[in-house]
Structure formats: structure tokens, C-alpha cells
Amino acid sequence: IGSGLVGSEMCIRDRPYASSACEMVAEILQYICDNIRIKSIEADTLYAGIVIDTNNFTNKAGARTFEAAAFLRRNGADIVRVRKLLRGDMNEYKAKAETVRHAEVYKHYALSVCPSSGLQSPTIVGAQAANELLNITGIKASIVFTYYNDTIYLSARSIDEVNVQLIMERLGGGGHMTIAGAQLKDMSLEDAITLVKKTIDTMETEGAI
């Protein structure tokens, strides 16, 4: 550059089908130069991000996801350390268990309320409980309601049969086909559950889901 200034460079990486940002970072590191080495704690962190966003490699995990994971393992990512890093406390575990225990099955949808008392991040626990409900045979999608800070947070999950994004969009939210959410205000949990049921009924009648 004539003025002697170094121009800024930007790398734009757009992969809508990537499992996570951590996968893309690992992929860039892998090919940015030969024989690159990263610290084990950095590898652990990136690996943990992939594990979280893919729900233990069960959601949106493609061949390149596993290639990124293999690269991180070669660079010191330790699955035992990562597992310990991702463990929750007893209150979180009990809350998830209560959410699953009290779930209602409505037209192949598992609906439940996640208790928020005593939890540091109740909305995260609610999302984790929604994932757990998909492990039940016959459940096409799950929606967990978490009341926190005067707002009802909806965490919707599915595997491949229901586009939960469409349901959440009807409720003012959004997301992706298998992972979506919404927020409801100025109503009780009972009214929120009734609203979701009516939305499911309406969309099924319309053939929208």
C-alpha cells in the first residue's frame, strides 16, 4: 500500500450446514498452515463446543464435524476432561429429572415445565431437558417451558419428523428445524401450555407441520 499502512484482512467463513462455530474454527486451524499445534485447553474448549452444539454428535454432525473432532483429539483434546467440564450440579440434574418425570405427551409431543428455583441457568437446563425427552420412544418433538425473570422460555427440540422452527415462529420465536425457541410474557404457565397445544392443533389442521 502506497502510504505504508498494512491493509486489514478478513476471512469470511459461511457454512450453514456446519454443526457449530467451534467446528468451523477447528477446520480453519487445521488448514491455515501445516503442522499447526494448539494448546490442549484450547482443543478441549473447541471439542466441548462441538459436543454441546451437536448434543453428543447426534444433531447436525456431518463428516466434517468428525474430521474437526479428530483434529482436536490429535491436538490434545481429552474426552474425559471435556466430560468433567460439562457436568452439571445436583440441582440441575434433579431439575432435568423432574422435567422428564412430569412430562405430558400430547399428540406425540412431549410437553413439560422445568423448575427454575435454585438453578443458576434455568433456561439452559430447560433446553437440556428438551433434548432428554427426545430419547423417549414415540416422541416426535419436545417443548419445555421455563419460567424465569417474568418470562416463559420455550425450548423446542425434534429429531427429524417435526419442524419445530415453524411452531416457534407462530409464537413469535424462531430457530432451526430441530432446535428452536420462543419467549412468552404476561401469561401463566398453564395458559402458555394451552396456547402451544392450540398452535399445534391449528398447524396440523392447516397441514403446516
What are these regions (language model features)?
Residues 13-16, 55-56:
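Flexible, glycine/proline-enriched loop segments at strand-loop-helix junctions
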Residues 8-9, 33, 46:
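A glycine/threonine-rich phosphate-anchoring loop and its flanking beta-alpha core
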Residues 47, 52-209:
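Hydrophobic helix-and-loop "lid/oligomerization" segment in the mid-to-C-terminal part
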Residues 26-31, 70-74:
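Short glycine/serine- and small hydrophobic-enriched flexible loop segments
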Residues 27-28, 39-52:
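Internal alpha/beta core interface subdomains
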Residues 16-27, 45:
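Active-site histidine-anchored catalytic micro-motif
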Residues 27-39, 57, 201-203:
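A charged, well-structured terminal subsegment
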Residues 1-7, 11-12:
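Single conserved hydrophobic/aromatic residue that forms the stacking wall/gate
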